[in-house]
């Protein structure tokens, strides 16, 4: 049983999947840091010192009454909130990740496939057959007589 499991794990596609998941998680962490630490602070500064992580709407106050200075204070007080700032961060994070995957993975693969397809279209298929000029059936290229209509070929 262990031997079968070892064979399964060592298959190429399982290892490739594991590597893809690890690299994808690392890439997601990089994009998340890019959005949170590099892009959002200048955008927040341009909009008047807005911290998108602290944009929220209080639906129900917690044990300690509001107004709450930050999302963390509201959550600590037990307030029920809609965290639309966190959602905006996640949305920007997703858009950047989707654009990166499109431009660095999907688009190059599509271009490679199109290039491969155009190479196949340019190279004519070499065949060892020809059409009989009398009955229009496929016959061997070296045939001197058609086996179907028995016509003499030149």
UniProtKB/Swiss-Prot annotation:
Residue intervals passing through the bilayer: 14-34, 86-106
Localisation: Cell membrane
Positions in coiled-coil regions: none
InterPro entries: Mechanosensitive_channel_CS, MS_channel, MSC/AndL, MscL_channel
GO terms for MF: mechanosensitive monoatomic ion channel activity
UniProt KW keywords: Cell membrane, Ion channel, Ion transport, Membrane, Transmembrane, Transmembrane helix, Transport
UniProt family annotation: Belongs to the MscL family.
Complex formation: Homopentamer.
Protein name per its UniProtKB record: Large-conductance mechanosensitive channel
Lineage: Bacteria, Bacillati, Chloroflexota, Dehalococcoidia, Dehalococcoidales
Gene field: mscL
